[in-house]
Amino acid sequence: MDVHTRWKAARPGALLLSSPLLLFLLLLWAPPSSRAAQPADLLEMLDFHNLPSGVTKTTGFCATRRSSSEPDVAYRVSKDAQLSMPTKQLYPESGFPEDFSILTTVKAKKGSQAFLVSIYNEQGIQQLGLELGRSPVFLYEDHTGKPGPEEYPLFPGINLSDGKWHRIALSVYKKNVTLILDCKKKITKFLSRSDHPIIDTNGIVMFGSRILDDEIFEGDIQQLLFVSDNRAAYDYCEHYSPDCDTAVPDTPQSQDPNPDEYYPEGEGETYYYEYPYYEDPEDPGKEPAPTQKPVEAARETTEVPEEQTQPLPEAPTVPETSDTADKEDSLGIGDYDYVPPDDYYTPPPYEDFGYGEGVENPDQPTNPDSGAEVPTSTTVTSNTSNPAPGEGKDDLGGEFTEETIKNLEENYYDPYFDPDSDSSVSPSEIGPGMPANQDTIFEGIGGPRGEKGQKGEPAIIEPGMLIEGPPGPEGPAGLPGPPGTTGPTGQMGDPGERGPPGRPGLPGADGLPGPPGTMLMLPFRFGGGGDAGSKGPMVSAQESQAQAILQQARLALRGPAGPMGLTGRPGPMGPPGSGGLKGEPGDMGPQGPRGVQGPPGPTGKPGRRGRAGSDGARGMPGQTGPKGDRGFDGLAGLPGEKGHRGDPGPSGPPGIPGDDGERGDDGEVGPRGLPGEPGPRGLLGPKGPPGPPGPPGVTGMDGQPGPKGNVGPQGEPGPPGQQGNPGAQGLPGPQGAIGPPGEKGPLGKPGLPGMPGADGPPGHPGKEGPPGEKGGQGPPGPQGPIGYPGPRGVKGADGIRGLKGTKGEKGEDGFPGFKGDMGIKGDRGEIGPPGPRGEDGPEGPKGRGGPNGDPGPLGPTGEKGKLGVPGLPGYPGRQGPKGSIGFPGFPGANGEKGGRGTPGKPGPRGQRGPTGPRGERGPRGITGKPGPKGNSGGDGPAGPPGERGPNGPQGPTGFPGPKGPPGPPGKDGLPGHPGQRGETGFQGKTGPPGPPGVVGPQGPTGETGPMGERGHPGPPGPPGEQGLPGAAGKEGTKGDPGPAGLPGKDGPPGLRGFPGDRGLPGPVGALGLKGSEGPPGPPGPAGSPGERGPAGAAGPIGIPGRPGPQGPPGPAGEKGLPGEKGPQGPAGRDGLQGPVGLPGPAGPVGPPGEDGDKGEIGEPGQKGSKGDKGEQGPPGPTGPQGPIGQPGPSGADGEPGPRGQQGLFGQKGDEGSRGFPGPPGPVGLQGLPGPPGEKGETGDVGQMGPPGPPGPRGPSGAPGADGPQGPPGGIGNPGAVGEKGEPGEAGDPGLPGEGGPLGPKGERGEKGEAGPSGAAGPPGPKGPPGDDGPKGSPGPVGFPGDPGPPGEPGPAGQDGPPGDKGDDGEPGQTGSPGPTGEPGPSGPPGKRGPPGPAGPEGRQGEKGAKGEAGLEGPPGKTGPIGPQGAPGKPGPDGLRGIPGPVGEQGLPGSPGPDGPPGPMGPPGLPGLKGDSGPKGEKGHPGLIGLIGPPGEQGEKGDRGLPGPQGSSGPKGDQGITGPSGPLGPPGPPGLPGPPGPKGAKGSSGPTGPKGEAGHPGLPGPPGPPGEVIQPLPIQASRTRRNIDASQLLDDGAGESYVDYADGMEEIFGSLNSLKLEIEQMKRPLGTQQNPARTCKDLQLCHPDFPDGEYWVDPNQGCSRDSFKVYCNFTAGGSTCVFPDKKSEGARITSWPKENPGSWFSEFKRGKLLSYVDAEGNPVGVVQMTFLRLLSASAHQNVTYNCYQSVAWQDAATGSYDKAIRFLGSNDEEMSYDNNPYIRALVDGCATKKGYQKTVLEIDTPKVEQVPIVDIMFNDFGEASQKFGFEVGPACFLG
């Protein structure tokens, strides 16, 4: 029985409660229950009462108690115990409390020093712990890291590991921690934590040890509680663990919930304590917790000796129990209110406990006779037997018996109940409870208190010193523990006896043939099971590793579930097997494959600490994570279609100052400046008079294309044009001819394991059958894919006139017409109802930037993006060895456009240029601010007199209205005069590459260049552009029909390759394993037809085969007969860009166009002849710092410079060991363009070069003369839909409609678009002056208007004060008809009117922008027969055919085509180094190669200057998953996982008697074809780490049902894979996939490896956390890690703002030193810990560069007072005075003379000191002193 948690005993004074009146008074006084400081019982949460491994029961603190015949129960914990739980279980609802108590009754093993409990956060950092032993330590570290390890509270002079029982209470309150030992000694220590400390509850609680700590708690423990109240510690010996001689503690007590569970005979009455209940005195009104059990109070206080009637010392209130307490609670509520001492003895009130009708409300006294009676009892003072259940309920002289009450909360207590007991009280009346019919209390007299012992001799102990005492005597045997949790299912029992025959089976399902199974034999020993339920042997790490490998192999070898087989004969029903004995809990098995996510299970008990599982399968997608780090920039994508204009984004933060913008519009004329300096050479003057005609010039460059001419006649097809821009992705082309084989490439690296291959290649084609008869016309097929555009057809005959079309879109503006006469003013129409929202128009031209909008709300966190495309090349890596000089690079691409230069001084004003041609209409500008008030205009010309309107009634004079909003912008004015020519700007930065220019003329073919050297294989290029259609091949012979393939996905078009030379035939390779399925091969050449064999006899009907894989497209068939005309197909997609046609004849000169947008900067023209030297331009602004370029090619030798001054002495470099000569490095990176060399002398005139490539497009030539009028062109193709035209001119006014009824008041509509201007109204009153507007841009030049007749001047209005804007009024009554009003504002668009008459045919419009996709049109007319469609999906299986006659043996077939290549074999062992071949002739320079892999470590170069501070690189892409590493050491148990998947099906029982035959199932499909068995054994090995299930299906495709031998090939391949993998585990290669533990390990396996960078994984396990280090095999196999860039050191300086004697991390520019691997990634703490564990010594050098500053010894005084101090990784300070392992290799700084350096070496066997993390410098601060330092790598030697 479990007593480690609670005590219960009858309390004096409880007799008072037997009075119903008093109970009623207490009920009256009951306040609402407040929340308890409920203790968290760690022993219960860790399942101690089920005795996990390493835990046994023993006698507790008290061997006897006066109130009990049984000893206390405790638990003995051995070193085998591994107990942990999630911290969340301690405090599931809230965080860890700031102030709390830890209470424990414990007897530690004598002389031990171990942590009793440790709490870790989510990162694995210990945040709380209690270490028992001499000088116990309370470890506490909050979320800020306070206090540090040196400030942990230490309690010296106390020995908790003396082999005796101790009651220890720790109270943590604010910044103090108090230890109360054995209820007597009290010590308070300062706890330097932050004001609001946080202990993370997302980690784990470990009992008895720490992670990676050898010391494990051993001893006995009775109680371990966490209480969220710091005051609980002071009451520990009163409320939680009372003295043994306490007969009746002042606490309620109760019997153990179910003593029979542990003592079947009913013996053993044990008290256990109910936790006290602390109440917050400041919060009396909290709601009761849902799990309170109000009934319990009345019972708990009823067992009282009759003679004791003193008042209650502490009255219990209604408890609040957590789930953990519920399991042992009966009806007790003996929890304590923690109240101030004044209130401490006041009896607290009670709530209405709900005894049926007995207590209806607090205001009425309870009738003892009604409802369930209140149980009462007195203590029996003589040893009488318990009365039978049910007796003595009303008799105070008998003993009270309580009844078992069913639990209302989902049978939570059911395991504790006696199901046979009576229940006289219904559960609804009382609530959950427990039997207490065995409480018999014997009151004894306490013995005299023993005398105080003599004071012991003081111990002379230093902190941390351990003195082991003799072991104490063996304690008495513990009580039997409670039953354990249900163990795992035992092993399958023995087969039962033969059962009766089973029933007839159900009809069998349609069976599918399963592929033959595989058989796998592996030479590993597994833990064999013993008898049923016995525990298997432990498995060693190597075996478990092999098991993990085997598990992988099993998973890989296991194919997908085979199809359901035919129904077998039913076996006989066996009797149930004999039940196996309950086994011990087995070791945790490997994690199974992830099942479907189940519903959340109930909170499970915490499991025992298990081994670290292997990595689980990929989980279900989690919730959207936070936005990830920015990935590398991807490769530039293909240009997308122009998107819709986005909404204005939120206003961003102010950017960094941008480059100078483009020149703005001309400002207003400034004041006249001072006379400027003479300007630079002016522009050319005006054009002079034409000179005499010169001789005919040479043929000029092609001019710009002239204006569009009329369509010419159909020309002959031109020669193929140059390569156009990439078109849209085309459809797959037809099968091309097979090119000749390329040269044999170099052997590639072994690839990664491939994905499962597709289905295998199709079988050999069958013999060609006789041609069938022509079939009947089939139904029209489905819409085929859109074919390629055919060749341009001959012009067809004119069609019949079509139907009248619908009204066309509004045409573009025509030429301005002549001004018409003024029309009659129409009546004002009513505003029509708002029309439906029209479709979005085409995207308008890009407007000028609007003002920045307000910032929008932040959007929701987006999902983390998918992995991007491979990024651009990464940041430069660590400087590699100097490579050989690379080939000269190609000229780089044009740089980006430079920032605009500062404005130059104004040049002299140029003469006015000729009037430019009219540009295209510009985009509509933004509405400007109102301009400044203009001067009073002159009288305008009088307009023509209008018709006289009817006289209106005289209206009252209105008040001046408020200032109206700015009116809609007027129509664009007529074009103004062209502006003056602007000043020439400075040369801008080179712009970004412009868009591809117009295709130029075909250049002459250049001479064939010399053959280049073979380059390295390039990376896969982007999808190539669409190649030109190949020439039609000769018509092939009719091929055999291929199997129907599945439609393939569109692949990206590849670059068109050049045919390579035919390679020599390679040597014949060894016979490979059966390869995985290769890609579909090209169709082989047609074989010569064999002789026709005699007809065979009909074979049996085959089962339908599996659908074959997609075959390659067959050769083109013969042209079929034209089909019937089909329905009109949907409109095809835009065709590909056609070849550029021949230029048509010049058309007539068109009218000048409107001003065009400013064009993009054109590509540079051809190199002009050398110009005169220009005058010195003004200096440009300093450009931004560019990246440091690679050295350019050597410039020409300069003139010798003047002799420089004497330089400072350089530092002496380290003397490195002589390395092996490295092999020549790969070709280096292409260098950045070097700085321009000095101008060379003019070279000799070269010979005439070959014709150059076509130059870029030249400047626009002069317009050619008008050509003769060409003949009219044919009707062109309809143009694409043009952009939406400008609004047309207003049409004639329509007839007035009939007046409609007055509609209801509509909602306020959205602001409509500006309507057309109304006719001029009478002049309004003069408005207030407007704000000054910006100066408008000059309008385009207008055409002169007709002069109008002079108008009459209007009357001048008076200025009225602006009124406020009024609210909208309600609509008034309909008034009498007013005078004719002004035209109203334009209403919303009306309904579409009927189509008007067809207008005259407009001019040919220019091609518009691409329109939006239209609706799907009606079916078109049947087009011509398209190309052959992709094969359809396979149809359903046909019916089984009738067996044909057996055929005769056919003649041998012709040899089949070559089979697909087999899979790549495993990498062979490294071959011997071959002799170097003779030096070949120097080849031509090759193309620039790819960035090569890093070369081997070169000799140490001279120290470079310190580089500038680099920015931190972006987070790298996730690496590929490495192979599974060996099993690591067991980690701490993780949080409880989700429910596991359903277990595997058990083995089958013995065969039963035959049942009745089932109905025959449907026939299965045909099996796969047979296959020839390869000879065994197979020599080759395979490199794939696991075999894909899909490949197993393919490989097994030829296996029959009976012959299982074919699967052996796969098994032997797997065994070879495993053999290779185990070989690599024994002898790791130091690669990322196969890392070694340390460099020493690597050297032992491969003593011939050179020094260099290798991958290590000190903690083994999964290799994904391996890291790259530098292995110094020359130094015996050291493993070296490097300081990161910021920790490598600091350049020499005087450090004026820092203080001597402070750590470098406290400097303003300082930091703690951190270390990275050879790739710059930080090395994990765990990996460094393992690396230290595997090392015997470590060393590290630090170089101190000084100027008159001491680093180590001061030679002047001979002292080391100013020596540098180091802080080791274990936070230990190291210097000359306390560490003999530091020595100075060079101590040049000792003399304090000039620039020197001191090299200090730390070579220590205390590997935990290295690497150093901080440095203290002590000698600087004077004006003449400077220092810097360099930190070397930290190297560990095993």
UniProtKB/Swiss-Prot annotation:
Location of 3-hydroxyproline modifications: P680, P686
Alphabetical UniProt keywords: Collagen, Extracellular matrix, Heparin-binding, Hydroxylation, Repeat, Secreted, Signal, Sulfation
Record GO cellular component, one term: collagen trimer
Post-translational modification: Hydroxylation on proline residues within the sequence motif, GXPG, is most likely to be 4-hydroxy as this fits the requirement for 4-hydroxylation in vertebrates. Sulfated on 40% of tyrosines.
Protein location: Secreted, Extracellular space, Extracellular matrix
Primary localization: secreted
Biased composition range(s): Gly residues: 1294-1303
Low complexity bias: start-end ranges: 335-345, 374-387, 413-428, 460-469, 506-523, 559-570, 671-686, 722-741, 747-756, 908-917, 971-990, 999-1011, 1088-1104, 1259-1268, 1485-1494, 1542-1554
Bias (Pro residues): 470-485, 687-696, 1106-1115, 1380-1398, 1454-1469, 1526-1541
Chain positions covered by the region annotation Interrupted collagenous region: 444-558
Gene Ontology BP, a term: collagen fibril organization
Region (Disordered): 242-545, 559-1574
One Gene Ontology term of the molecular function aspect: platelet-derived growth factor binding
Complexes and interactors: Trimers of two alpha 1(V) and one alpha 2(V) chains in most tissues and trimers of one alpha 1(V), one alpha 2(V), and one alpha 3(V) chains in placenta. Interacts with CSPG4.
Described purpose of this protein according to its UniProt entry: Type V collagen is a member of group I collagen (fibrillar forming collagen). It is a minor connective tissue component of nearly ubiquitous distribution. Type V collagen binds to DNA, heparan sulfate, thrombospondin, heparin, and insulin. Transcriptionally activated by CEBPZ, which recognizes a CCAAT-like motif, CAAAT in the COL5A1 promoter.
Protein name as it appears in the record: Collagen alpha-1(V) chain
Native source organism of the sequence: Mus musculus
Lineage of origin: Eukaryota, Metazoa, Chordata, Craniata, Vertebrata
